[in-house]
Swiss-Prot record:
InterPro entries: Metallo-B-lactamas, RibonucZ/Hydroxyglut_hydro, UPF0173, UPF0173_UPF0282_UlaG_hydrolase
Keyword annotations from UniProtKB, A to Z: Hydrolase
Alphabetized PANTHER family for the sequence: UPF0173 METAL-DEPENDENT HYDROLASE MJ1163 (PTHR43546:SF3), UPF0173 METAL-DEPENDENT HYDROLASE MJ1163-RELATED (PTHR43546)
GO molecular function terms attached to this record: hydrolase activity
Record's protein name: UPF0173 metal-dependent hydrolase Pnuc_1524
Amino acid sequence: MVNILKKRAFGGAILAALLLASSAYVGAQSAPAAGAQGKTELLWFGQAGFRIKTPQGKMILIDPWITGGPKTPPMYKNDLAAIGPIDLLLVTHAHVDHLGDAPTIAKTNNTKLYGPADMVTPLTTLGVLPAELGYRFNKTGQVTPLPGIKVTAVQAEHSSLLVWKNPATDKLESHPAGEPMGYIIELENGFKIWHMGDTGLFSDMKFISEHYKPDLVLIPIGGNFTMAPDDAAYALRTWVKPKMVIPMHYNSNPMTKGTLAEFQAAMKGSNIKVIPMTEGETVQF
């Protein structure tokens, strides 16, 4: 069984509350593989940015829009070092609210940035990212970037454009950045997380779920650029059917009007555990 422990960080203070059986989110999980210790911990920075601490203590960072994020807690917004050492950096596409601080974090940590092939290429050719820190892969490509960690790139229905300030002209330039992706991340104990990235509805969500069998889904609900709450609920209830879901990509842009309350209402009566988070909060599985 999976018991979820939720924490919230504001400034330097951390409030930890243990959710007892009567109120905890509980879901089934595969038996941990031999040698896998500890729990899985997710920290949400806002938008689509998460840090995953794996059962063996590896740190995975996804879509780190930290310094520019309007809802990023100050302890991280004002000091990227507060995120801690990062072992693996994943970016779903080149839009600024996903690529964000990834190149800076990659260089600071000497950690490779894994992302869509045609996003990583302009990052390296333009000098935004050193070539040795870029790793290119594409949809359905599975990689093992760290011992015991598997990452598979999957479909996302969205767009991708790299906006870059040319230091020679001091002007912004737009560069094609390939296709966006989502990620199936399998941890040391077999626990699988599907970070959907930015996406609208597509029927192969059913295939992806049936084939990869994610335990936890991180799903956008804000609308306008991604699924709205009702679309996200339809995808989950009809096609994906995970054990647990964390809504993301809302509450950060006036154009993404979808709300947590609307999503919770659309999920009412479902057996899928909805785990709402606030920016700076962590959950443990």
